Regions:
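Residue-level signature of mid-helix packing/kink "hotspots" within the transmembrane helices
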Residues: 23, 51-59, 142-143, 266-274, ...
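Extracytoplasmic gate region of multi-pass secondary transporters
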Residues: 25-30, 205-278
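Intracellular juxtamembrane helix-capping segments at the cytosolic ends
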Residues: 32, 110-123, 130-131, 326
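Helix-breaking motifs and short loop linkers at transmembrane-helix boundaries and internal kinks
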Residues: 37, 69, 90-95, 107, ...
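Conserved MFS/SLC helix-loop-helix module at the cytosolic interface between two early adjacent transmembrane helices
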Residues: 56-95, 280-286
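Paired small-residue
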Residues: 84, 95-103, 311-319
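Helix-loop-helix hairpin linking two adjacent transmembrane segments in secondary transporters
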Residues: 134, 138-185
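C-terminal transmembrane helical hairpin of 12-TM major facilitator-type secondary transporters
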Residues: 220, 227-229, 252, 256-326
């Protein structure tokens, strides 16, 4: 029983180490633009490429996990994540930046998909909680590194931040990967009473023929778009709202509004995952999604109308990320 918790913790650590590839990106956009004179739109194409390769290749990476186990897939993913940020550190053309996005996206997808899938296999009796805790590593992982990354960008330049954090995070993921193991096939758990669960596994071709799959796919594309927009563009939004470097004092801390928002957002984005995982085990998946999606929608609209106030900016971005992390 204790061994599966060790496997869960290892997955959480790996997820935390790849979080900055997505959640820390907004800190780099303006420094890159200032150095090379590229437009924000051109730079953000790299983020789009990253998200596409991070998500769309997960089924293929899942096949490798089924065939070879989680260890080699996460190991390769960790190497690719480190290499991607290493390339970013010296990228002097948009083509190189885009290539690095492909590399790091494949790596992040391999780590993310494998760690979540492995957690579900080790905890068939507590799937919502296991998935939530593992995803929390990704959501909150950058909370402890956002401030030092921001400080390094300000003092030593974004290239050093890419280089040192990329290599460091990649090494940790590789070390974690060496300790991962496949859940035993015979491991069973009691189904959660309040949650409907399928009686059999579906083949990919069968899944594609189910209407509910396409409904869920469209639903999550739309929901993810709102959160990813905030993730990638938060720095630019803060500048447009003129709250980027306005000092905000809350909870005994005084930080620039953007830095404060990023730190709080990452904490809430992490806490919400096990929270909503627990809620979904209690009331079901569909009611939980309805609640979370509604909160996110209200948060984004409120941010649009009231985000020019630095305190409101911090609080409302926290609400958006709390709901989006579900």
């Amino acid at each position: 029983a204790s061994y599966r918790w060790i496997q869960l913790i290892l997955g959480i650590v790996a997820m935390a180490m790849i979080a900055n590839l997505q959640y820390g990106w907004t800190l780099f956009v303006d420094p890159i633009a200032a150095k090379h004179g590229w437009s924000r739109a051109a730079i953000q194409v790299a983020f789009t490429i990253f998200v596409l390769t991070e998500t769309w290749l997960v089924p293929i990476e899942g096949w490798f996990v089924d065939k070879f186990g989680p260890r080699p897939v996460v190991l390769v993913g960790g190497v690719l994540c480190g290499v991607g940020w290493f390339i970013n550190s010296f990228a002097d053309s948009l083509a190189t930046l885009y290539f690095a996005a492909v590399i790091s996206g494949i790596g992040a997808g391999a780590v993310y998909g494998t760690c979540v899938g492995n957690a579900l296999k080790w905890f068939p009796d507590r799937r919502g909680l296991a998935a939530g805790l593992t995803a929390a590593g990704f959501g909150a992982g950058s909370a402890v590194t956002i401030i030092p990354i921001s400080a390094m960008i300000a003092t030593r330049g974004y290239q050093d931040a890419f280089l040192y954090f990329g290599i460091g995070q990649g090494i940790i993921v590789v070390l974690v990967a060496l300790c991962l193991s496949r859940a035993p096939e015979h491991k069973k758990g009691e189904a959660v009473a309040n949650v409907q669960q399928t009686k059999r596994d579906y083949k990919p071709s069968e899944v594609l023929r189910e209407p509910v799959f396409w409904i869920m796919y469209a639903m999550f594309v739309m929901v993810a778009a709102g959160g990813l927009m905030a993730t990638a563009q938060l720095g630019s939004i803060a500048r447009d709202f003129k709250v980027f470097d306005v000092q905000v004092s809350m909870m005994g801390l005084t930080l620039p509004a953007l830095t404060f928002a990023l730190a709080i957002d990452r904490v809430l984005n992490g806490l919400t995952r096990p929270f909503f995982g627990w809620v979904s085990d209690q009331i079901g998946r569909e009611p939980t999604m309805f609640i979370a999606f509604a909160i996110e929608a209200v948060g984004i609209l409120a941010l649009f109308h009231y985000g020019h106030n630095p305190i409101a900016f911090v609080i409302l971005t926290g609400i958006v990320f709390f709901a989006w992390g579900e």
